[in-house]
């Protein structure tokens, strides 16, 4: 990959050993879902994005002062399920100047409304651009998604 493309490892409740392996394998950022164990945070030498499920957001304040935390990802209750959530259900967005991404069931049909409602700094998509009948991503859905994001 060209050096300007940042490589992000997406993990759930990583151990210190997993963090070490991620760093040794050339990732630039870690996106952490689940628990952030103290020993993993101590091992972390690259920046991370802290992901929160919308039903469990009471922790984000502890990351405001964490210098390694460069932003947040707000995701649905069941990440990776393709299910969206009520974007107005996020009561207080962080006001610490760190960017936040919106995730959770985004697809070409709803991403424009999501951006309009939440004004995120970016969006995160996976299942919303999957092929309908076979595994993998659908290039046409990706193109439609990107076009809508750029217009929003």
PLM regions: where:
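Glycine-rich phosphate-binding active-site loops on the catalytic face of alpha/beta enzymes
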Residues: 32-37, 77-79, 117-142
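Structural alpha-beta junctions
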Residues: 46, 150-152
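C-terminal active-site rim and adjoining tail of enzyme catalytic domains
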Residues: 103-110, 115-129, 143-150
